[in-house]
Curated annotation (Swiss-Prot):
Protein name: Large ribosomal subunit protein uL2
GO terms of biological process kind: cytoplasmic translation
Family the UniProt entry places it in: Belongs to the universal ribosomal protein uL2 family.
HAMAP family in alphabetical order: Ribosomal_uL2_B
Keywords of the record: Ribonucleoprotein, Ribosomal protein, RNA-binding, rRNA-binding
Gene it is expressed from: rplB
InterPro entries on file: NA-bd_OB-fold, Rib_uL2_dom2, Ribosomal_uL2, Ribosomal_uL2_bac/org-type, Ribosomal_uL2_C, Ribosomal_uL2_CS, Ribosomal_uL2_dom3, Ribosomal_uL2_RNA-bd_dom
Subunit and interaction comment: Part of the 50S ribosomal subunit. Forms a bridge to the 30S subunit in the 70S ribosome.
MF-aspect GO terms: rRNA binding; structural constituent of ribosome; transferase activity
Organism whose genome encodes this protein: Brucella anthropi (strain ATCC 49188 / DSM 6882 / CCUG 24695 / JCM 21032 / LMG 3331 / NBRC 15819 / NCTC 12168 / Alc 37)
Length: 277
């Protein structure tokens, strides 16, 4: 889908660039595949703010997305492509031969009327799901599982994908968008193709209000605060903070490595940081 630019009738439209969604379904989602979604405002179960600068935003309905794709060897037809406010990608409504309905992440080049199927030995075409062990090397995939049966976790955002670059002792070697190469069990399912809406990275909100509509409040810099609120706060006139960047709680940030998951280090063959050297 293309990008839309506007004549600057108002200041907020001068820089505005949005994705043209005219090709998507304009009605409401399937009621049986949705549930209510309450606003958290960045607060946890005790009512304290755990994520700053969140709150407000337009009301949403949550759509249940089938990330597992375990309805094997049952052909489904794409009924329509829909917008989903809870993610950057578009979603596709699938009607299976037995009458069941499901939402899946829509890959690029998937159109209304196309057939999709999940199975151990199915065609390599966009929207089909199969184990990584069944795919030819070089295949572009998305919605990749990290544990068999857990559901897709990798490459689910708009325009993202991973590439199967090799195999090693029952494991598949994937190259991710970040440049990282990692091992994933060959029994893990993945969907063929890249995720839809690749132009998402080119949008320009044009005004602060659009971020507020999404539930994002103004992100205040530490140097603009008082000393009581942030380690960078205070000072006479404008200051640069006077120390290496830290979080409001004094921990180093902006480039400081924070990864501490030693148990999965063995699955990372090439770090995403090596690419930059």
């Amino acid at each position: 889908m293309a990008l839309k630019h506007f004549n600057p009738i108002t200041p907020g439209q001068r820089q505005l660039v949005i994705v043209d969604r005219s090709g998507l379904y304009k009605g409401k989602p399937v009621k049986s595949l949705t549930e209510g979604l309450s606003k958290k405002g960045g607060r946890n179960n005790t009512g304290r703010i755990t994520v700053r600068f969140q709150g407000g935003g337009h009301k949403r309905t949550y759509r249940f997305i089938d990330f597992k794709r375990r309805k094997l060897d049952v052909v489904g037809t794409v009924e329509r492509l829909e917008y989903d406010p809870n993610r950057t990608a578009f979603i596709a409504l699938i009607r299976y031969e037995d009458g069941e309905l499901a939402y899946i992440l829509a890959p690029q080049r998937l159109a209304v009327g196309d057939k999709v199927v999940a199975g151990n030995s199915v065609d390599v075409k966009p929207g089909n799901a199969m184990p990584l062990a069944s795919m030819p090397v070089g295949t572009i995939v998305h919605n990749v599982e990290l544990k068999p049966g857990k559901g897709g976790q990798i490459a689910r955002s708009a325009g993202t994908y991973a590439q199967l670059v090799g195999r090693d002792q029952g494991m598949a070697i994937l190259r991710l968008n970040s440049g990282e190469q990692r091992l994933v069990p060959g029994a893990c399912f993945a969907s063929v193709g890249a995720v839809s809406n690749p132009d998402h990275g080119n949008i320009n909100d044009g005004k602060a209000g659009r971020s507020v509509w999404r539930g994002k409040r103004p992100h205040v810099r530490g140097v603009a605060m008082n000393p009581v609120d942030h380690p960078h706060g205070g000072g006479e006139g404008r200051t640069s903070g006077g120390r290496h960047p830290v979080t409001p709680w004094g921990k180093p940030t902006k480039g400081k490595k924070t990864r501490s998951n030693k148990s999965t280090d063995k699955f990372i063959m090439r770090s995403r940081h090596q690419r930059k050297k």
